[in-house]
Swiss-Prot record:
<dbReference type="GO" id="GO:0000785">
    <property type="term" value="C:chromatin"/>
</dbReference>
<keyword id="KW-0539">Nucleus</keyword>
<keyword id="KW-0012">Acyltransferase</keyword>
<dbReference type="InterPro" id="IPR034680">
    <property type="entry name" value="Kae1_archaea_euk"/>
</dbReference>
<feature type="binding site">
    <location>
        <position position="186"/>
    </location>
    <ligand>
        <name>substrate</name>
    </ligand>
</feature>
<dbReference type="GO" id="GO:0061711">
    <property type="term" value="F:N(6)-L-threonylcarbamoyladenine synthase activity"/>
</dbReference>
<keyword id="KW-0963">Cytoplasm</keyword>
<keyword id="KW-0808">Transferase</keyword>
<dbReference type="GO" id="GO:0046872">
    <property type="term" value="F:metal ion binding"/>
</dbReference>
<comment type="subunit">
    <text>Component of the EKC/KEOPS complex composed of at least bud32, cgi121, gon7, kae1 and pcc1; the whole complex dimerizes.</text>
</comment>
<feature type="binding site">
    <location>
        <position position="320"/>
    </location>
    <ligand>
        <name>a divalent metal cation</name>
    </ligand>
</feature>
<feature type="binding site">
    <location>
        <position position="167"/>
    </location>
    <ligand>
        <name>substrate</name>
    </ligand>
</feature>
<keyword id="KW-0479">Metal-binding</keyword>
<dbReference type="GO" id="GO:0031490">
    <property type="term" value="F:chromatin DNA binding"/>
</dbReference>
<feature type="binding site">
    <location>
        <position position="292"/>
    </location>
    <ligand>
        <name>substrate</name>
    </ligand>
</feature>
<keyword id="KW-0010">Activator</keyword>
<dbReference type="InterPro" id="IPR000905">
    <property type="entry name" value="Gcp-like_dom"/>
</dbReference>
């Protein structure tokens, strides 16, 4: 079976083609292409601008995936698309494209939960069996475990997502958004040496990041580190970003280092608590923030201390992509699931545990 997957819940537009061979052998990624809307330094991406980007690029990406996979529309069994969660306008622009392909190619639609797409792609690539999942991205922060054909949420953010916290601090420092603000924060953090104390807010298996963001924004302002320092965006490799401050004054690199260390410590704590609760020795990290090497390192230390292991994917599959939507969509399609055209509206707050996972025991 072949599926084409369309993802566009945020600023990344992805199209992928997945093959599930009829002989039951391992699924194959035939094509996985992506194009990112990059906003100017110091700014986030607005829904209307992101949707405009997706509309401009989606047909080109679909054509490119068909060429790379060396297939025709006749070979495709279903059209899978992200139905939520995400930003309304970008979601809708990709849903319209999916409906167009469904009508044009006369193929059934399969609406996919974005979070479930991340989980299923992570399970496929890493080979993890029944892990505790840490899902961390620009719009989501959840600790998840599978039970009784649902991906149950054991803990989550009480306000903003971890990726949103990192991205917004990148705006405060006027760090470049290319290739991604979180990535540039990570590169600066590697050069930081001074740990600045920040609010640490964990409540059971839930966490909060808004207070931490407010505190570090205030610190940056008090040390004159907020806003553009020159006519150009801050380069993570520039000496000005990492030079030691006077009288122990923290640098931008120190603030990025402190933010990462505090956030990731919170994530490790709630993940370990979930592991103890469900009795799992595996952790699967998914979502765009899951690419962060320091997060993987800290989680690995915790997991090994418990006699367990950590699984993560590289940027091809960790960052939003179309192939994860094709993978999750095909799993649902093979159980008989279809999304009628009249039920294909997007849901911005599509909960992970709202999906009936019929394809797992």
């Amino acid at each position: 079976m072949l599926a084409i997957g369309l993802e566009g819940s945020a600023n990344k537009l992805g199209v992928g083609i997945m093959l599930h061979p009829d002989d039951g052998s391992s699924p194959q990624v035939l094509a996985n292409v992506r194009h990112t809307y990059v906003s100017p330094p110091g700014e986030g991406f607005l829904p209307k601008d992101t949707a405009r980007h997706h509309r401009a690029w989606v047909v080109r990406l679909v054509k490119r995936t068909l060429r790379e996979a060396r297939i025709s529309p006749d070979d495709v069994d279903c059209i899978c698309f992200t139905q939520g969660p995400g930003m309304g306008a970008p979601l809708q622009s990709v849903a319209v494209a999916a409906r167009m392909l469904s009508l044009l190619w006369k193929k059934p639609l399969v609406g996919v939960n974005h979070c479930v797409g991340h989980i299923e792609m992570g399970r496929l690539i890493t080979g993890s069996t029944n892990p505790v999942v840490l899902y961390v991205s620009g719009g989501n922060t959840q600790v998840i475990a599978y039970s009784s054909q649902r991906y149950r949420i054991f803990g989550e953010t009480l306000d903003i997502a971890v990726g949103n916290c990192l991205d917004r601090f990148a705006r405060t420092l006027h760090i470049s958004n290319d290739p991604a603000p979180g990535y540039n924060i990570e590169q600066l953090a590697k050069k930081g040496k001074q740990l600045v104390e920040l609010p640490y807010t964990v409540k059971g298996m839930d966490c909060s990041f808004s207070g931490m963001l407010a505190a570090i924004d205030a610190l940056a302002a008090s040390y004159g580190l907020d806003g553009p320092q020159s006519d150009e965006a801050v380069d993570a490799n520039s000496p000005a970003a990492v030079e030691a401050g006077e009288n122990g004054k923290p640098t931008r690199a120190d603030l990025c280092f402190s933010l990462q260390e505090t956030i990731f410590s919170m994530l490790v704590e709630i993940t370990e608590r979930a592991m103890a609760h469900v009795g799992s020795k595996e952790v699967l990290i998914v979502g765009g923030v899951g690419c962060n090497e320091r997060l993987q390192e800290m989680m690995g230390i915790m997991a090994r201390d418990r006699g367990g292991s950590v699984h993560a994917t590289d940027e091809r599959f960790c960052i939003d992509n179309g192939i994860m939507i094709a993978q999750a969509g095909l799993l649902a399609y093979k159980t008989g699931f279809r999304t009628p055209l009249k039920e294909s509206a997007c849901t911005q707050r599509f909960r992970t545990d709202a999906v009936f996972v019929k394809w797992r025991d």
